[in-house]
């Protein structure tokens, strides 16, 4: 059985048997987690989202502070964001391990953000990273393709350590070979995976103009038996459509109200100007 109608679940070969999913890396972890949450809820699954490191607050999400009331929120919304709060950093942080275990027992799928990168698109983990719960079924590594062609100093979280790992200088650019190594090396994003299933999601494929680069990455990872999925989590801008009704005989008004001036500007022109500002 599989989620055949769901783009990201299908692309990452996520199956209903994958109940505890950890997401590591950089360049789109949180966005991927929320996209997977959306697809899982649409598939009728009860979902809990949490972190073992730090995660941005999401005020519009159903939130269970310290995991309290999580089950009721899942029943009401289909999913819940459950975490403790680091008030100094104004971020969400890890639940106590007992609470994390408890959370995993009240949902069909637990999605865990198990790494941090401060919004940088490229990352190599340090000794203490990532923080993957031991009961995890599958690990998804995320990296941003927009880092290709950028210098390590520009694109990497902890550029000095990243350059050391890659055998480069901080001023050197990140290449497709660097990306392949980052997601396939046991000291890279494969770190801590062990015998769990492993997937790679490479985000922002729209920033790569040469299709051959994507083909090369896919081919080399395939040779290592590492499934990779390319995509883009950027939200498309929604255009606002506006209709202005500008007709009528103006009998009660006594004159053509469309041409009636307010502060020297015809009413229709003033209204149109306001609508165009709203559309911006």
State the predicted function of each range.
Residues 23, 48-51, 81-84, 110-114, ...:
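General beta-strand structural signal in soluble alpha/beta enzymes
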Residues 25, 52, 84-86, 203-206, ...:
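Structural motif
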Residues 239-280:
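N-terminal glycine-rich phosphate-binding loop and ensuing alpha1 helix
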Residues 2, 90-98, 106, 115-223, ...:
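Conserved catalytic-core segment of NTP-binding enzymes
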Residues 77-80, 105-110, 138:
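Loop/turn-to-beta-strand initiation segments
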């Amino acid at each position: 059985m599989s989620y055949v109608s769901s783009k990201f679940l299908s692309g990452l070969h996520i199956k209903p048997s994958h109940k505890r999913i950890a997401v590591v890396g950089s360049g789109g972890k949180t966005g991927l987690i929320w996209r997977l949450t959306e697809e899982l809820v649409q598939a009728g699954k009860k979902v809990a989202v949490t972190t073992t490191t730090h995660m941005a607050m999401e005020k519009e999400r159903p939130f269970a502070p310290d995991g309290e009331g999580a089950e009721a929120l899942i029943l009401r919304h289909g999913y819940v964001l459950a975490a403790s709060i680091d008030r100094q950093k104004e971020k969400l942080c890890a639940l106590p391990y007992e609470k994390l275990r408890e959370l995993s027992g009240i949902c069909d799928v637990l999605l865990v953000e198990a790494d941090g990168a401060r919004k940088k698109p490229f990352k190599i983990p340090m000794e203490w990273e990532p923080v993957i719960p031991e009961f995890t079924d599958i690990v998804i590594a995320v990296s941003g393709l927009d880092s290709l062609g950028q210098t390590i100093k520009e694109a990497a979280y902890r550029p000095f350590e990243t350059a050391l790992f890659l055998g480069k200088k901080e001023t050197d650019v990140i290449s497709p070979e660097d990306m392949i190594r980052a997601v396939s090396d046991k000291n890279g994003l494969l770190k801590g995976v062990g015998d769990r299933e492993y997937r790679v999601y490479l985000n922002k494929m729209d920033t790569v103009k040469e299709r051959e680069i994507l083909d090369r990455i896919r081919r080399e990872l395939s040779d290592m038996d590492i499934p990779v999925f390319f995509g883009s989590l950027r939200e498309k801008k929604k255009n606002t459509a506006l209709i202005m009704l500008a007709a009528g005989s103006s009998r009660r008004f006594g004159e053509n109200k469309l041409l009636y001036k307010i502060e020297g500007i015809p009413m229709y022109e003033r209204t149109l100007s306001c609508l165009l500002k709203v559309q911006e």
